Structures are given as C-alpha cells and as structure tokens.
Amino acid sequence: MKIYKVLNNNAALIKEDDQEKIVMGPGIAFQKKKNDLIPMNKVEKIFVVRDENEKFKQILQTLPEEHIEIAEDIISYAEGELAAPLSDHIHIALSDHLSFAIERIQNGLLVQNKLLHEIKALYKKEYEIGLWAIGHVKETLGVSLPEDEAGYIALHIHTAKMDAESMYSALKHTTMIKEMIEKIKQYFNRKVDENSISYQRLVTHLRYAVSRLESNEALHRMDEEMLYFIQKKYSFAYQCALELAEFLKNEYQLHLPESEAGYITLHVQRLQDLSE
C-alpha cells in the first residue's frame, strides 16, 4: 500500500484502482512521505474519498491530531458498546464537533444543551457512551467537558447508528418532545422530576408516538370503554393531552388520534401524581 499524500501522523491518502482512499492507524504515516509503503496490518480504517469524505481529508490536515485520535477512540468504544458499526460520516462530524468543544472550553465558553434531559431519557446507551467520552477527554487532555457535551456526543452517535434518519430528523424529534414536555409543565404549573421513571416512560412514549405519526404508521388503539374511563377519572390530565394534540396539529401538521391521547393521559397522570 503506497502513500499518495501524508495527511497527519495517523492518516494518509492512497490511490487504488484510480480511486482515492483515506487510510488510518496509529502512527502509520509518522516520518513517512509520498510513495513510502504502509503495512496492511497497521491499517485500522479505510475510507473511499467521496464528497463527504473530502471534508474529512481536510479535517485530518487542519485539526489537532490528538482531537482526531480522541474522536476515533470514542467511535471505536461506541461501536464496541453498541455491537454495530457506525456510519462513515461520524468520523467527520464527531472530530469537528469535539475539537470545537475543546477549543470553546479552553477559551472559557460554555454552551448549554437545552435538550440534555430529553437526550438522557431517549438515548440512554448513547448518553452513557457520551459520559465515557468526556471522561476520556479529561483523562487524555486534562480538559473537563461539561455534561452537556455528553448529550451532544450521544446525538452524534445515535445519528450514526441510523440508516434512514438524519441528524436533522433526530434533533427535530427531540425538540418536538421537549416542546411537549414544556407544555405539560406549563399546564400543571409545576416542576417535574426529570430523573424519575415516570418521566422517562413519558418521554419514551412520546418518541414512539411522534415517530409513528410522522411515518404514518398505526398507533395502538385503546378500548373505547377504557378511553371513556380515563377521560372521566383523569379529566385534567386528559385535557392536557388534548392540548398536546392541538399543538402537534398546529405546529407540525400531525394528527394525534383520540385513543393515543388516552395513552398519553396515563403517562401524564403518573408524572402528575409523582409531583404532588
């Protein structure tokens, strides 16, 4: 495997069958130059240079190498924890994001993640990986990233797991759920325990409902007698669910069926009982 261009100590550009490829591995390009050989057993990753990987090629030449190495450590750890490969795009997105986050912290700038509680509830496994990641940054560079960054990293990992859904879609769903939670808080005029099981169940159910509504998939139907019972027994919580339905209709053009409002009522009521 012959080097076409050295990108940094751990990455190089090669040409095979008239195709440019990025190869990566610890120290594979250290003190090497064009036309030097790279042993195949030292190569850990190979990317074909397409449009999106063109940016990765630039990132490899401009970002601090230690930031890229940490991003790759996080990706490898995530793939091990999830027992699944992540999309190539995360190598660009996470390296770029992580380097910028480290730079911000070193300059004393904090960016609050307003979706943190929702991310923790929706993407638990990815969030745990995010916590490992900020610990790894601390251990490697001595830079303390806030918990907010664990949330951002979790979103990047979640997006990289998906084939059909983009980062935009994941952010949109998370934002929609946050807006619905805020409406519930306003309706009951009190704080909720965002670490409670009831809160996590509500968020998980809202994610399920929103995802199915957007993809026009059928939602579980509730027995009419049960729905009537819920409407009467938990009338205040049911009115809250109807307000959420109106919100989804006006803001996102999504129609929430009456039976689904019944299921949401049960989750809202549990949260209300816990807050009293």
From Swiss-Prot:
Superkingdom of this protein's organism: Bacteria
Impact when changing residue 96 to Y: In sacT30 mutant
Lineage: Bacteria, Bacillati, Bacillota, Bacilli, Bacillales
Organism: Bacillus subtilis (strain 168)
Matches recorded under InterPro entries: BglG_antiterminators, CAT_RNA-bd_dom, CAT_RNA-bd_dom_sf, PRD, PRD_sf, Transcrpt_antitermin_CS
UniProt entry keywords in alphabetical sequence: Activator, Phosphoprotein, Repeat, RNA-binding, Transcription, Transcription regulation
SUPFAM superfamilies membership: PTS-regulatory domain, PRD, SacY-like RNA-binding domain
RNA-binding keyword on record: yes
Phenotype upon gene inactivation: Deletion mutant exhibits a 10-fold decrease in the synthesis of sucrase SacA.
Family, per entry: Belongs to the transcriptional antiterminator BglG family.
GO BP annotations listed: positive regulation of DNA-templated transcription
Record-linked Pfam families: CAT_RBD, PRD
GO MF entry, a single one: RNA binding
Biological role stated in the UniProt entry: Mediates positive regulation of the sacPA operon by functioning as an antiterminator factor of transcription.
Start and end residues of each PRD domain: 62-167, 168-276
SMART domains, alphabetized: CAT_RBD
Name this polypeptide is given: SacPA operon antiterminator
Activity control: Activity may be regulated by phosphorylation.
